Curated annotation (Swiss-Prot):
Family, as annotated: Belongs to the bacterial ribosomal protein bL9 family.
GO MF assignments: rRNA binding; structural constituent of ribosome
NCBIfam families reported in the protein's UniProt record: L9
Function: Binds to the 23S rRNA.
Protein name: Large ribosomal subunit protein bL9
Length: 147
């Protein structure tokens, strides 16, 4: 019997492969446990169709991330913080403050966990890197000013 593997099966193959197996193994184990489906023409066509849709969605998502990367590269956020008598910041600028300023000033929401920077403790222009997903990274600037 031919089966289409839905999940990786040790010593048999990876998800998406069509394998020839004994009827009992296919029916009583692979199909019963949800590791595979019988490889009929309809199942194979649906699998190919789903794979094409998934690839199209991935291309669309990557295109949107590239567009966001381009938008972010043009941004310079302005953040005002109180400073001490010697000109140093009180506490610094955190990822949370950067994410909030990005949302307020540019209407772009980014999770603070995707920001790749430490707390900034000095005034001036700083570069912030953002992990957008699918190995796409963007950079934008923040300008920290005294209040």
């Amino acid at each position: 019997m031919k089966v289409l593997l839905i999940k990786d099966v040790k010593a048999l193959g990876k998800a998406g492969e069509v394998k020839e197996v004994k009827d009992g193994y296919g029916q009583n184990f692979l199909i019963a446990k949800g590791f595979a489906k019988a490889a009929t023409n309809e199942v194979l066509k649906k699998y190919e169709s789903d794979k094409k849709k998934e690839a199209e969605n991935l291309r669309f998502e990557i295109a949107n991330l590239e567009k966001l990367k381009e938008e972010l590269s043009k941004i310079t956020l302005e953040i005002s913080k109180p400073v001490g008598a010697n000109g140093s910041l009180f506490g610094g600028v955190t990822k949370d403050e950067i994410a909030h300023a990005l949302k307020e000033q540019s209407h772009i929401e980014i999770d603070k966990k995707s920001l790749e920077c430490d707390t900034f403790k000095s005034l001036g222009l700083h570069e912030v890197s953002v992990k957008l997903g699918h190995a796409i990274h963007a950079k934008f600037n923040i300008n920290i000013k005294a209040e």
